[in-house]
Curated annotation (Swiss-Prot):
Annotated residues for binding of acetyl-CoA: 396, 402-403, 421, 439, 456
Cofactor note: Binds 1 Mg(2+) ion per subunit.
GO molecular function: glucosamine-1-phosphate N-acetyltransferase activity; magnesium ion binding; UDP-N-acetylglucosamine diphosphorylase activity
Annotated segments matching region Disordered: 454-474
Broad class of where this protein is predominantly found: cytoplasm
Catalytic activity: alpha-D-glucosamine 1-phosphate + acetyl-CoA = N-acetyl-alpha-D-glucosamine 1-phosphate + CoA + H(+); N-acetyl-alpha-D-glucosamine 1-phosphate + UTP + H(+) = UDP-N-acetyl-alpha-D-glucosamine + diphosphate
Name of the featured protein: Bifunctional protein GlmU
Role according to the record: Catalyzes the last two sequential reactions in the de novo biosynthetic pathway for UDP-N-acetylglucosamine (UDP-GlcNAc). The C-terminal domain catalyzes the transfer of acetyl group from acetyl coenzyme A to glucosamine-1-phosphate (GlcN-1-P) to produce N-acetylglucosamine-1-phosphate (GlcNAc-1-P), which is converted into UDP-GlcNAc by the transfer of uridine 5-monophosphate (from uridine 5-triphosphate), a reaction catalyzed by the N-terminal domain.
EC nos: 2.7.7.23, 2.3.1.157
Cofactor(s) recorded in Swiss-Prot or TrEMBL: Mg(2+)
Length: 474
């Protein structure tokens, strides 16, 4: 492939989104639309990407700087916005001036890299190549006008099209590959003599024909690849179509999804970590589960309904029961050991590390804590900044008090400890191996191995106790 530069159109206001967030920063699968398009440029190994900004540039340009990730990206402003041709005019001075220029739309997120490579190849370096698609309802799109010989003669925008032209179902996707050496000359000849009073980039097609430059249309069948976003409804429809495509790809690998229409795989919106789900054999995922960031499910893992799992590695044979939240952060993420049972209604926060056959039950929260093989916290408990040994049984209603108002402190619970119900372990504290903490105790000092520790008020019982009577209402 010859030298390739990319222009990304990202100046539009997106009025129909009815949002103060610029359209190109609206999220699809957890990633801004423009982030998907920058990925396309990166996948093409573009020499340079020039992003044309305008509306919301103060928000869009910092995002571009964060998302560049090794790509040579330049931003140019289009002020005022006078059409697509005018936008490309602003970008030309930032190009290298040779090779091929491919024009992408910042709100068309799902074009495949191999499709774009095929478009560039169709242009052959010296031709103008258009990416087109046939739509059952082409309203709003520019129509591809062909001559009697089938050759492309031009593109007519929907608002300027005649009734006969509006009947054409082959449309221009907004993506083209242009010989860099010809682009500036064509742009200089653009006029705004049209219904919109704008400078249309599509007018260069007729100029190419007039100049004897071949125009080729690379037509694809998959309309999803060139679908743009102009409204919340379109964004939601594209999200569902994209998620269904991801679900089908997983099922083709052998993953068992209870309902592929109720599955989501997203980027981690907090950190930008790309959504990736790797599954071993015989993995089962129930309905309405959301995966974000990097998640790995080992062989035979079962995920119950309505779980949210981010940045986690779940080892073979583990079961995550319904309504569980696993909220890891890279690089380490949350670790769940082989054969572990988690949930329902459990929460594993960053730094949670569960060993083999650990049980974390309903309404148990674990943060920045490790639990060794066979440890159990089955009911209504909190473990924060704790190291829990093998075979520990941690009772219902018990918590580690890890924060003194300024600093966090660790609790160590050694192997074979039994912690009764409704206990408070005030860190820093160590419960020695084989020890027992009596129910209802507040432990503030470390205890030796094998000891029974009880720290609670003495019970007082008053027989024949009379409860206070309610006062009469005034």
């Amino acid at each position: 492939m010859s030298a390739l530069d990319v222009i990304i159109m990202a100046a539009g206001k997106g009025t129909r989104m009815k949002s103060r967030i610029p359209k190109v920063l609206q999220r699809l699968a957890g990633r801004p639309l423009l982030g998907h398009v920058l990925d396309q440029a990166r996948g093409l190994q573009a020499r340079r990407a020039v992003v044309v900004t305008g509306h919301g540039a103060a928000e869009v340009e910092p995002f571009i700087a964060r998302a560049a990730d090794g790509l040579d990206v330049r931003c140019v402003r289009q002020e005022p916005q006078l059409g697509t041709g005018h936008a490309v005019q602003q970008a030309v001075p930032a190009l290298q001036g040779d090779g091929t220029v491919i024009v992408l739309s910042g709100d068309v997120p799902l074009t495949r890299t191999d499709t774009l490579r095929a478009l560039v190849a169709a242009g052959g370096g010296g031709q103008l190549a258009l990416l087109t698609v046939t739509l059952p309802d082409p309203a709003g799109y520019g129509r591809i006008v062909r001559g009697s010989d089938g050759a492309v003669r031009g593109i007519v925008e929907h608002k300027d099209a005649t009734e006969a032209q509006r009947a054409i179902d082959e449309v221009y996707s907004g993506i083209m590959a242009v010989p860099a050496g010809l682009l500036a000359g064509w742009l200089a000849r653009l006029t705004n003599d049209n219904a919109q009073g704008e400078y249309y980039l599509t007018d260069i097609v007729a100029m190419a024909v007039a100049d004897g430059v071949p125009v080729v249309a690379h037509r694809i069948a998959d309309a999803l690849q060139v679908a743009g976003v102009n409204s919340p409804l379109q964004l939601a429809e594209l999200e569902r179509a994209h998620q269904l495509a991801q679900a089908r790809a997983l099922m083709e690998q052998g993953v068992r999804l209870a309902d592929p229409a109720r599955f989501d795989l997203r980027d981690d919106a907090r950190t930008g970590v790309r959504g990736e789900l790797a599954c071993g054999q015989d993995v089962e995922i129930d309905v309405n589960c959301i995966f974000s960031g990097r998640v790995e499910l080992g062989e035979g893992v079962r995920i119950g309904a309505h779980c949210c799992i981010a940045n986690a590695r779940i080892a073979a044979g583990a079961v995550v029961h319904p309504y569980t939240h696993i909220d890891g952060e890279q690089p380490a993420g949350v670790q769940v050991g082989e054969g572990a049972l988690v949930g329902p209604f459990a929460r594993l926060r960053p730094g949670a590390q569960l060993g083999r056959e650990v049980h974390i039950g309903n309404f148990v929260e674990v943060k920045n804590s490790s639990l060794a093989e066979g440890a159990k916290a089955n009911h209504l408990a909190y473990l924060g900044d704790a190291t829990v040994g093998e075979r520990v049984n941690y009772g219902a209603g018990s918590i580690t008090a890890n924060y003194d108002g300024a600093n966090k402190h660790r609790t160590v619970i050694e192997a074979d400890v039994h912690v009764g119900s409704n206990c408070v372990l005030v860190a820093p504290v160590t419960i020695g191996a084989g020890g027992t903490v009596g129910g209802g105790s507040t432990i503030t000092k470390s205890t030796p191995a094998g000891a029974l520790s009880v720290a609670r008020g003495k019970q007082v019982t008053k027989e024949n106790w009379q409860r206070p009577a309610k006062l009469p209402k005034a």
